[in-house]
Amino acid sequence: SNFKGYYGYPATVCTSVNEEIVHGIPGQRVLQDGDLLSCDCGAYVEADGVQWHGDAAFTAVVGNYASETDKYLDRTTERALWAAIAALAEAGASGWKDARINLIGDAVESVVFDAAQETGHELGIVEEYVGHGIGTKMHMAPDVLNYSVSSKGVKLQPGMVLAIEPMITAGRASNETLDDEWTVVTRDGSRAAHWEHTVALTPKGVWVLTARDGGVSGLEPFGFTPTPLSA
């Protein structure tokens, strides 16, 4: 794991339950049927004295019961992640011409906005915690925002590797950190979901390094096919 000891983090994974958004510390808590659990984990391999890092997260409902709100929150967050990856795939298919990093935030925000409009329920995009570049270190430039901004950000190009990780709440996105100095929770007690993949930009598209199929199944609904690193 590349998590344990990172800035003093005490565990090998982050486990965030219900109103916990991110950086939850595993402990003795007994999970209950219907809990919403987000797991964020990372690993690295070392070659020739150089570390190469990966980072991923997913959300799942514990047990056999899930409220419709929780299921919709989870699906929306995962779809926002894949919509962002699809936006990268589209840019890559066009040779990355004039492609800028904030197309990711545009894609995430569009999915969340449409979902909120469809259901009439409030959904929040957490802005304080964002994705990042990744490679020889777990966190590298550039920041990868999950929301739209006026600036378009850095130019995208083949060879970049990005950790994309939308964190969405079923209420307001306002949050605070608990006394353990790690666990981030929603202020209004609303539940949160967190999905993440590490994505390599190839000359003609993307390859999802943390998906077993490279992103085939996730991109298929958007009409794109990932391109291997050698393509």
What are these regions (language model features)?
Residues 1-231:
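Active-site neighborhoods and metal-handling regions in enzymes and metal-associated proteins
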